[in-house]
């Protein structure tokens, strides 16, 4: 429509059917223009054609009012093709004064021709012409419309309406009449609102409102279930309509983002347009508008947006922006509790991406991500559980501080349950989470004390499902259960001769020399390198070899090929020599070669790009089973570590990248930064920081880095390659602190195998040059050169080892380091001719030292020869019989740690014995030159386990009161722990040792506590063991009861009245205790006990007796005469009762103290099975103790109150004589009155002890103590002098003492 007038024309358009061009001026009448257009249409459109019309009609009525017959009427009519689509366009260059809407509306009211559809199907009330009622598509784009014609809403079959590129500010509310509308496009207009009536268009499939001025559009999509496309791009939206009801939505555009996905939401394409900011305008991130829009409401819970977020977070910059938005983080967390499984899965993927950053991970913990996580972990849907577990796995890995916050009692319980899930992938993810949590040292201490978790992992490691047993083995490796892991994967045991260690120096391309020496060792031994050594380590190029040989199990030929690739790809010249910068670089290189290295390092920077080197390392270290160092520990490979230098701390520290975890209890130095008053310090995880405290702490290190990262960090030689950085940590070449890592290898061996000696130590250098006169140069630069040479020298370590190791003749030390001028090549040398010279020098070195290579090969193959001899000797012995028990053959013996620690309890009733086995042990060790340390646990008065409590008054108000048993069957006390107070031997004590009168009440301990503080006796033991690393045997001269080993004792008063149920049960407890101890002569015990029918008989027979481990001393008696003349006697006893125990939980928390040590018990009763298992689970070699376990004293059920009031009337209290002389006379008189039936009974055998004037001990079986003393001495003689295995030593010692019953408990194989 132009402003000039011309005759109308009609042409056939293949896309639009027929196109009609009509020009008119603004002054023309709209009616005239409409008539002209209508006439043009009549001419242009095809002529009418014959159409058969079929019409069905009812004929006649039946009795019920229905139609009886149907009539068929057929006729032929002239009709035109129905009108389907109309497009109104404004020609380019037309005037802007008129939009032609009036012409269109008049044209729509006209009825140009008969309708093509039956008249009843059309709304007769419509003002639209009949022919227009068949229109399904109408386009009014680019017409300059200011208002949408209302007549358009009268088209009943309209499905597509296009109104793009107009000037519409609003849409008419009548648009809701278009019930069949499927596509509505109103892009590039000026809309500021959308009519509410649009929600009546329930059939919409596409709604496009791009590039308008919508701020808060009121769009109600609840009835538009079929909407698939929603475009709101380019609108200044402040509020996103609720799109959750749009389940079919697959295309979405918002602000500056366009989103298109496939039907299943598996593939999502996201396009983000950046804003064009001016030079002076502040730049905004591309997500600055999108992020607050979708995270302001719950719309992000839509599946399409959830998938979009995953796509967006693949970009590191996008993750950073979203991670800083707390509201966005909280919305993502809320998405994991969605009812839509796809949303949960995508939210977990997004959160996992975010959690890789430490700062965002801390933000997630601050937003309480663990609460919904624990909720979803209880879901019945395995897919949802797997998705959430992936978040847990990522969070636990990213940071120790985050991991420590994650491990709660509920989380641990949930993970244990999921480890036993029926779905293998759920099991695998749960095991990965447990393993990642164990990277944190504090978490590892907690997890290792979980007995059920340990047993579960041991069970899962042998499951037939490969992915489950690999994950279980990984968890055991991270927990530091190296021995359990070795036995589970049937790994090779450390030879009996001792450890075999290989260390390799740094040297860049000179590592070719190391490879050549290793080839000679491999040739002479006939075994691959990884089978010859238990520990392999290296620095820089030596570290790369250590990884290649020990972790990747490569051949030496493959290692040689790696060096050639290294020279070709990494160290090749990349800058043309005629280039000016290259020329400048060469000049600086020449300056370096003239001994000005320090200047070179400062000015020149890195010579080679690390990108190609990293690519080569990633290709070499790729592993489908996991790329972490610790994940190689499950493959039955040697222990391997690589030395680097952590330069992001001051001073720089050695850093050990290792493929193993230290056993729990090993003092470690954490390299995690902690902020204190604006400064950064390193946190120490060592057991104590006291002055003078012995610390054999491990170096800083990690087993959670990727394998290629370890090599890259160790090889970051200054000038040659850039430093290697991960997060805030930065590493340089390990040669700065340990170019010869042999000292580090010895330290790591001591930490891994504390009771195993080193048999063979092989150190290989990369070649050195002879000492020569230094050429003159710049004075200060020469000083820097000297300092660098000294720091990287390998000879200082060699000199120290050559001096010290001869003092340890059992260690065979071999050092291979050729000294030749041909070994002086550059670290990045790429000239093959110089490589050949180096190889020639090494070959000459090998030929000149044949005997040394022969000796080292013989020493390394000695374990293999011993294994073959053992098998040969085994065959004839068991050819016709059963095979030997593997448990016996693997029985441990005393290692190189040969000191003894003797521990005795404070106030022990055994300390007063005339003959005591502890004194005999001290004499034996003194006479045989065995270093013995003693520990007497001390407990301050009122010593309690550290926990706050509330005081309550004691029930005892006077020492002259009758006793009763509280009705509570179980009460937790701070000193005795959980005690059954209805047991006769566990009455709450009235302390006579100066303790507090009031007790403190504490809650039962939670499991597991975050920080466990051992109380005084246990702290003393733990510190003593940490200070004495050479202790190989821990002798616990402690009594045992059902709660554990008794560390200290205290005195109290106990009162019992007779006659009464309490007295009967007390007397029964005494008899049962005596019978349990006198098992070897029950007939004598029965004859003695037959004469004791009451407490009166008991105290007449003995003033002092023992119930279990508790000593009772008779003090006195009070007689009370009741109104019916019945006498009630109240007997008062002084008891020596346990006040502190070494419980299984305590043993597990002190796990590092027992590792590789032999535990010996020598009390009356042996330890309980729980105590033994705790020791063995904590790494003890063996536990030896009496076979008879402490038995529970029969329980007493109080019927009502057992207390009896003491009155002054009719009461006479008799205090028993405590003077020594009177006691002797009194005992002699009582023996005359009541003579035991058998003179040789155990009662009489111990009578002489009761007359001891010291009055310290009233034991009953002194003869047994003398035999125990002899037995202990014989046991130690077998262990130390004969070097017998533990079980064999015990058998030989028991052979001479048939009465004693002792058992040796060994770890399960």
Swiss-Prot record:
In terms of PANTHER family, this protein maps to: CALCIUM-INDEPENDENT PHOSPHOLIPASE A2-GAMMA
State the active site.
Answer: 540, 733
Query: According to the UniProt record, what class of enzyme is this?
Result: hydrolase
Gene that produces this protein: PLA1
Q: What species is given as this protein's source?
A: Arabidopsis thaliana (Mouse-ear cress)
Give the compositionally biased regions (Acidic residues): 1216-1235
Checking CDD domains in the record gives:
Pat_PNPLA8
Q: Where does this chain mainly localize?
A: plastid
Q: What is this protein called?
A: Phospholipase A I
Which stretches does UniProt call biased (Polar residues)?
Answer: 1188-1208
A Pfam family recorded for this sequence: Patatin
Q: Where are the ARM repeats?
A: 315-356, 401-439, 440-481
Q: Where is this motif: GXSXG?
A: 538-542
Q: Can you list the GO cellular component terms from the UniProt entry?
A: chloroplast; membrane
Q: Which UniProt keywords apply?
A: Chloroplast, Hydrolase, Leucine-rich repeat, Lipid degradation, Lipid metabolism, Plant defense, Plastid, Repeat
* Region annotation (Disordered) ranges: 1183-1253
Family annotation (SMART domains): ARM, LRR_TYP
In terms of domain of life, where is this protein from?
Eukaryota
The record places the motif (DGA/G) at: 733-735
Q: Where are the LRR repeats?
A: 155-178, 180-201, 203-223, 224-248
PNPLA domain: residues covered: 502-746
């Amino acid at each position: 429509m132009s402003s000039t007038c011309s005759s109308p024309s009609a042409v056939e358009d293949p896309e639009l059917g027929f196109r009609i061009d009509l020009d008119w001026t603004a002054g023309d009448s709209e009616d005239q223009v409409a008539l002209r257009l209508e006439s043009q249409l009549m001419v242009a459109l095809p002529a009418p054609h014959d159409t058969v019309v079929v019409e069905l009609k009812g004929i006649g009525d039946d009795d019920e009012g229905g139609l009886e017959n149907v009539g068929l009427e057929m006729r032929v009519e002239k009709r035109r093709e129905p009108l389907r689509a109309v497009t109104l366009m404004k020609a380019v260059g037309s005037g802007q004064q008129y939009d032609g809407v009036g012409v269109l509306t008049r044209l729509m009211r006209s009825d140009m021709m008969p309708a093509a559809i039956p008249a009843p199907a059309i709304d007769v009330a419509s003002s639209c012409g009949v022919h227009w009622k068949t229109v399904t598509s109408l386009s009014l784009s680019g017409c300059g419309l200011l208002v949408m014609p209302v007549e358009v809403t009268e088209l009943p079959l309209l499905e597509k309406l296009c109104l793009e590129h107009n000037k519409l500010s609003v849409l008419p509310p009548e648009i809701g009449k278009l019930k069949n509308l499927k596509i509505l496009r109103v892009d590039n207009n000026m809309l500021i609102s959308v009519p509410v009536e649009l929600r009546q268009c329930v059939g919409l499939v596409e709604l496009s409102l791009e590039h308008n001025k919508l701020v808060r559009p009121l769009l109600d999509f609840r009835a538009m279930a079929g909407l698939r496309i929603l475009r709101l791009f380019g609108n200044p939206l402040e509020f996103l309509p609720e799109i959750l009801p749009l389940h079919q939505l697959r295309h979405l555009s918002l602000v500056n983002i366009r989103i298109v996905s496939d039907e299943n939401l598996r593939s999502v394409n996201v396009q983000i347009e950046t804003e064009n900011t001016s030079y002076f305008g502040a730049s905004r991130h591309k997500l600055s508008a999108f992020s607050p829009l979708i995270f302001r409401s719950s719309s992000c819970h839509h599946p399409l947006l959830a998938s979009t977020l995953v796509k967006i977070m693949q970009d590191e910059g996008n993750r950073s922006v979203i991670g800083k938005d707390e509201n966005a983080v909280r919305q993502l967390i809320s998405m994991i509790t969605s009812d839509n499984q796809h949303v949960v899965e995508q939210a977990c993927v997004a959160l996992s991406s975010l959690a890789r950053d430490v700062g965002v991970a801390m933000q997630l913990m601050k937003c309480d991500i663990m609460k919904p996580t624990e909720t979803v972990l209880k879901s019945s849907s395995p897919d949802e559980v797997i998705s959430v577990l992936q978040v847990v796995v990522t969070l636990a890995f990213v940071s120790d501080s985050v991991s420590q916050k994650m491990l709660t009692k509920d989380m641990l319980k949930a993970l244990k349950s999921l480890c036993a899930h029926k779905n293998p992938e759920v099991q695998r993810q749960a095991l990965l989470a447990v393993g990642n949590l164990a990277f944190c040292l504090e978490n590892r201490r907690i997890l290792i004390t979980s007995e059920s978790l340990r047993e579960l992992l041991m069970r899962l490691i042998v499951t037939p499902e490969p992915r489950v047993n690999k994950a279980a083995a990984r968890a055991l490796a991270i927990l530091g259960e190296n021995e359990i892991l070795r036995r589970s994967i049937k790994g090779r045991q450390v030879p009996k001769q001792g450890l075999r260690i290989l260390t390799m120096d740094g040297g860049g391309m000179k590592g070719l020399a190391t490879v050549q020496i290793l080839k000679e060792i491999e040739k002479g031994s006939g075994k691959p390198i990884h089978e010859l050594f238990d520990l392999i380590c290296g620095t820089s190029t030596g570290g790369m070899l250590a990884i290649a040989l020990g972790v990747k199990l490569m051949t030496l030929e493959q290692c040689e090929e790696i060096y050639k690739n290294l020279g070709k790809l990494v160290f090749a010249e990349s800058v043309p020599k005629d280039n000016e910068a290259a020329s400048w670089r060469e000049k600086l290189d020449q300056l370096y070669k003239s001994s000005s290295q320090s200047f070179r390092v400062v000015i020149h920077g890195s010579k080679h790009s690390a990108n190609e080197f990293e690519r080569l390392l990633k290709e070499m270290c790729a592993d489908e089973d996991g790329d972490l160092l610790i994940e190689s520990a499950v493959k039955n490979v040697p222990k391997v570590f690589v030395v680097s230098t952590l330069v992001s701390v001051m001073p720089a520290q050695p850093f050990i990248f290792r493929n193993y975890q230290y056993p729990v209890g090993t003092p470690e130095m954490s390299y995690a930064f902690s902020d204190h008053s604006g400064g950064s310090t390193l946190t120490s995880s060592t057991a104590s920081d006291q002055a003078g405290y012995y610390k054999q702490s491990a170096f800083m290190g990690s087993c959670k880095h990727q394998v290629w990262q370890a090599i890259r960090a160790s090889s970051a030689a200054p000038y040659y390659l850039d430093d290697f950085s991960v997060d805030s940590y930065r590493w340089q070449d390990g040669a700065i602190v340990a170019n010869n890592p042999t000292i580090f290898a010895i330290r790591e061996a001591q930490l891994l195998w504390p009771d195993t000696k080193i048999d063979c130590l092989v150190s290989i250098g990369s070649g050195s040059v002879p000492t020569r006169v230094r050429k003159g140069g710049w004075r200060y630069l020469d000083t820097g050169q000297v300092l660098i040479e000294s720091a990287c020298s390998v000879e200082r370590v060699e000199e120290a080892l050559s001096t010290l190791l001869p003092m340890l003749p059992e260690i065979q030390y071999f050092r291979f380091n050729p000294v030749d001028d041909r070994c002086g090549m550059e670290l990045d040398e790429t000239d093959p001719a110089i490589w050949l010279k180096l190889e020639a020098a090494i070959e000459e070195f090998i030929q000149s030292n044949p005997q040394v290579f022969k000796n080292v090969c013989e020493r390394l193959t000695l374990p293999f020869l011993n294994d073959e001899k053992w098998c040969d000797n085994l065959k004839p012995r068991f050819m016709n019989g059963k095979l030997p028990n593997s448990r016996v053959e693997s029985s441990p013996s005393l290692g190189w740690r040969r000191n003894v620690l003797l521990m005795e309890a404070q106030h022990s009733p055994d300390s007063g014995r005339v003959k005591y086995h502890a004194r005999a042990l001290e004499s034996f060790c003194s006479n045989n030159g065995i270093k013995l340390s003693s520990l007497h646990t001390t407990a301050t008065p009122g010593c309690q386990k550290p926990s706050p409590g509330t005081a309550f008054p004691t029930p005892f108000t006077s020492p002259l009161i009758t006793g009763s048993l509280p009705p509570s069957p179980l009460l937790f006390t701070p000193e005795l722990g959980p005690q059954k107070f209805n047991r006769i031997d566990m009455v709450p004590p009235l302390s006579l040792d100066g303790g507090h009168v009031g007790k403190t009440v504490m809650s039962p301990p939670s499991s597991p506590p975050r920080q466990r503080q051992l109380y005084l006796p246990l702290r003393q033991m733990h510190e003593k063991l940490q200070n004495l690393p050479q202790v190989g045997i821990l002798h616990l001269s402690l009594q045992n009861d059902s709660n554990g080993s008794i560390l200290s004792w205290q005195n109290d008063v106990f009162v019992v009245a007779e006659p009464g149920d309490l007295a009967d049960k007390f007397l029964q407890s005494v008899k049962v205790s005596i019978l349990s101890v006198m098992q070897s002569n029950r007939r004598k015990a029965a004859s003695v006990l037959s004469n004791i029918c009451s407490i009166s008989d008991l105290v007449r027979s003995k003033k002092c007796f023992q119930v279990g481990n508790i000593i009772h001393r008779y003090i006195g008696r009070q007689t009370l005469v009741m109104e019916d003349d019945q006498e009630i006697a109240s007997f008062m006893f002084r008891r020596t009762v346990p006040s502190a125990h070494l419980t299984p939980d305590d043993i597990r928390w002190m796990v590092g103290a027992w590792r590789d040590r032999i535990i010996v018990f020598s009390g009356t009763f042996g330890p309980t099975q729980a105590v033994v298992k705790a020791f063995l689970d904590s790494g003890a070699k063996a536990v030896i103790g009496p076979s008879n376990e402490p038995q529970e004293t029969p329980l007493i059920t109080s019927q009502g109150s057992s207390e009896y009031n003491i009155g002054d009337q009719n009461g006479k209290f008799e205090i028993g004589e405590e003077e020594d002389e009177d006691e002797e006379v009194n005992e002699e008189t009582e023996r005359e009155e009541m003579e035991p039936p058998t003179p040789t009974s155990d009662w009489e055998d111990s009578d002489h002890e009761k007359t001891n004037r010291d009055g310290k001990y009233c034991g009953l079986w002194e003869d047994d103590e003398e035999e125990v003393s002899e037995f202990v001495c014989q046991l130690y003689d077998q262990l130390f002098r004969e070097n017998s295995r533990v079980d064999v030593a015990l058998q030989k010692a028991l052979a001479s003492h048939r009465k004693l019953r002792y058992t040796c408990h060994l770890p399960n194989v």
